[in-house]
Amino acid sequence: DLAGQAWEVLAARRDGDGRTAAADRAATHRARAQAWAEATDVAGSGLDPRRASYALPAGLLSGDAAAAAVDLADLETRLADAYAALVARAVAGTRAPLLVASADAARAAAAL
């Protein structure tokens, strides 16, 4: 969910197509976070980790576009790695969404 919040901050600081693209990316991350919360039965509970506040990366908050891109690329790379690590633990038949999410995050990181 940190990635969703980070992209929302970036969307708020951009105009036009940049704002739309960042908002779309935020929505993707928020939807995945919701799906995970529901799949693990923590949605709406006191155990839902999305209830926490996040320390956003300094580069994202600096207003420097290059620093924000570096921080967002790092977040996306860490997500790609986390999704890939979960593939090995996933039950057969449930790996495809993890692979899709990992590849998507890796592409997003590379595009930054």
Give each language-model segment a name.
Residues 1-112:
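All-alpha RGS (Regulator of G-protein Signaling) helical domain and cognate RGS-like helical scaffolds
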